[in-house]
Amino acid sequence: MAIKSIFIIIIISIITSISELYALDPSFLRLSTSLQRSSFPQDFRFGAASSAYQSEGAANVDGREPSIWDTFTKQYPEKISDGSNGDVADEFYYRFKEDVAHMKEIGLDSFRFSISWSRILPRGTVAGGVNQAGINFYNHLINELISNGIRPLVTLFHWDTPQALEDEYGGFLNPQIVKDFVEYVDICFKEFGDRVKEWITINEPNMFAVLGYNVGNIAPGRCSSYVQNCTVGNSATEPYLVAHYLILSHAATVQLYREKYQSFHGGTIGMTIQTYWMIPKYNTPACREAAKRALDFFFGWFADPITYGDYPKTMRELVGNRLPKFTKKQSKMVRGSFDFFGLNYYTSRYVEDVMFYANTNLSYTTDSRVNQTTEKNGVPVGEPTSADWLFICPEGFQDVLLYIKSKFQNPVILVTENGMPSENDKSLSVNIALNDEAKIKYHQLHLTALLEAVSQGADVRGYYIWSLMDDFEWEFGYKYRYGLVYVDFQDGLKRHLKSSALWYHHFLSNSSSYQMD
């Protein structure tokens, strides 16, 4: 009887929170049957995503030691838009049960999160000590998800290298990282693999290498002095070294999983790569070649090795001896090292050829000999959003999916991030801020584009909204809100479902969908 009473209370609380959203302004939800969950394959899964440093908080709690992001945000607060950090973030570490309840309320099939390496291995290695409290946290989270019918999709590395390894040998600039990474993931597979059936080795390795080691905007903040105001780094060599050791770490992880765990646990493993769709700025042969080159340098940089065992030919030609080489043994290990492609897509770019190229002040940015822009003749590439880098380009999403299908042997694809932000306008009341109608339109357009790609043969099997909750958005701090769930950073981190969460709830329950104007 007590269990039945608790169940009734839970149901009432869910209805109340959904009703609160209706009460705000029911006009935002115009229902139709134009796009529903039933439009997608039966086993297609829908979810939302997060990452450890961006959401967990509890930075110095229960044995966790600093990552490079803890150090970067303290050492270079001027590189964060609002000077903030992830010390507290959403306090997901303490409030995960509340957040899982919201996931269930929305109707998520799956939740993507990452594991904090330095919460499991505070010093980065087993020799430095295994933190049982960290293992316990992720066990509790995984169990809570599964008990609520939500499938975990776990990212092993989401940009948060243990600071101890950065101090000891330079982190991903050193081949030693491959051994230490495999040691770390082995613990994760052993501790969580009986319940986690899908793993992402590394999130957006291209963005980590470019932003962290070419322009220095994110941790660890390295670049050549002629690129940005960095005190250390080499933008002509370090991005390629870091990428190389990321790829080898990924491949060694997949090899370990396949040899030791996959047959027993029955799971799958892949890498997540972010890309723009590269559109020739003008209909000329030079622009068309430039767009292909831009894709090679951004997406193919990682997708080519894990599919074919080596970097794109264009990179070999243009980067020369600054691009590391795989040994025959490494190439064999790297080739085919995925069960699925993880794709993060947000927006598109126009691309044109750079006609004049100087052999001075070299960097990853100049090596591709292209110029990326967000406008052509004063017209933006898509509808603008509150973020000056993100324009709404759903047709580019379809093009990316079909490009992956045709160039990379039609792999299984999971769309592991797709989303758009609203600005964190502190002058707005919470009730007004909860109405994020533009975000609903964005997702409707992109889901329609995804369906079209599937109809043309792309093997897409999942879609994850970025993000579950408003969180710490790297170099932008708390400037933007991507979440389905509003986090009130001014009032005790209280959670409120946004209108986009209600739309997703209706979409996932197959009852209705948002009608676009």
Curated annotation (Swiss-Prot):
Residues 1-23 form the signal peptide. A beta-D-glucoside binds at residues 54, 158, 203-204, 346, 417, 466, 473-474, 482. Disulfide bonds join 223-230. GO terms for biological process: carbohydrate metabolic process. It catalyses: Hydrolysis of terminal, non-reducing beta-D-glucosyl residues with release of beta-D-glucose. Coiled coil: none annotated. The keyword Chaperone does not apply. Keywords: Disulfide bond, Glycoprotein, Glycosidase, Hydrolase, Signal. Glycans are attached at residues 229, 361, 371, 510. Its EC number is 3.2.1.21. Belongs to the glycosyl hydrolase 1 family. This is Beta-glucosidase 17. It comes from Arabidopsis thaliana.
